[in-house]
Amino acid sequence: MKHITELFATVAHRVKPPVLIAVGPPWPVANLVKTLALPETDVTCAQFDLHQTDRVRETLAEVETKAEVVTVADLWDLPPRFNTVIFPASAQADRELKLDIVEQGAHVLAVGGLFLTLSEYERDSQFAKLQKKIFGKCGETPSSENGMAFFSTKTEESGARRRHEVKYHAKIGAGAPMEFVSRPGTFSYGRFDAGSRAMLEVTEINPGDSVLDLGCGNGAVGCLAGAMAGPEGRVTFIDSSLRAMALAELNAKANGATNARFVNATRLQGLEGGTFDVILANPPYYAKSEITRLFIEGARDLLKPGGRYYLVTKMPTAVMPLIFDTFGDCSVIENRGYSVVLAGAIGA
């Protein structure tokens, strides 16, 4: 969103504090805060993910401006006190998440407040439809190389809250099927991830094992792994997303996970070393990312002696050097078009 400040300039006169910047990438958010030039107490930046929250704070410091930065599972966890909600909508966000943010943003607007979407698309017909559906009317700026802005006024109190959640079932082998709730903006939305299935089908989990679901998303992997570990086993779910963690707790409870622990953290804080028999990782496919490095390097010291580390990927050549550097050795199991890398237990 490199033209966000130019796009915002076309609608800046409509903005009244206090302002909420709803999600959005760190640099566009920071540039908006700087452009607004409001007192720190008049601007709140909300994110769903602790890692993104940290990045927003770092970026605000880099551009030498300040705002309140909060992490929430849902925008409507905030009070309905804002006169303007700004949604810097990146092209990468999926339609369901965009709809979710617009609907939840309406709930935190005061009556008479303005909802403003900044889209980086030169021609965008999606937000006009979304905002008309929610607010009744929607104005827009002309199409331009800077993108388009869409603006709507909240004319009455919001109705009932509506979640854009999708339920699905999954099972591994002869295990019992489980039902999972998924929501936009979390891993494995709408269906059980094929890579996770490929990994669990070849994972060795014994009764009584202590399992870590690393980057758990909605908790489906941890719940299915916990069933394999049995009632004497233990599952720890960890994710940097508050929205994902809320879902993991919901799904674990619904599927009878009685010996479960839930950790919201960005860098595996709160996990004791040498405590896990099995660690399961399904990192983002941009394999050289900071998250993937953390998933690999941070896992080694968490394993018990003889513990097993599994990572599923479609790009094994991209992660193998880092896994070799971290664990010293590994093997690869091919399943369903995915490569499941096993490390930690080699030679044990």
Question: Residue locations for each model-derived region?
Answer:
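Short beta->alpha hinge that forms the Motif I/post-I loop of the SAM-binding pocket
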Residues: F48, L97, E120, D239-A244, ...
